[in-house]
Amino acid sequence: KMLEKIKEIAADSLGADVNEMTPETSFKEDLGADSLDLFEMVMALEEDFEVEIPTEDLENIRTIGDVENYLQNR
């Protein structure tokens, strides 16, 4: 359920196809996201999951699965 929501948010923020995403999908390499795209996605994630994701944590979040692991450990 969480993974599906993350994929939906990423698809909306990055203009990507949710059906082509897996936990291994890289935001930058596979989806062509730039810093602004990632910023928008993180803001949407924070709002949806009611968490704060500090900027320093973002360097460890490169894939859909990274987001899921991060949110599960919050």
Please report, for each region that a protein language model flagged, where it lies by residue.
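Thiotemplate assembly-line natural product biosynthesis machinery
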Residues: 1-19, 72-74
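Generic structural marker for isolated residues within well-ordered, non-membrane alpha-helices
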Residues: 7, 24, 42
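Phosphopantetheine carrier-protein modules
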Residues: 13-32, 48-60
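C-terminal structural segments of small proteins and small subunits
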Residues: 41-74
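Residue-level recognition of oxygen-bearing side chains
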Residues: 26, 36, 63-66
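Generic leucine side-chain signal with a strong bias for well-ordered alpha-helical environments
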Residues: 3, 14, 31, 36-38, ...
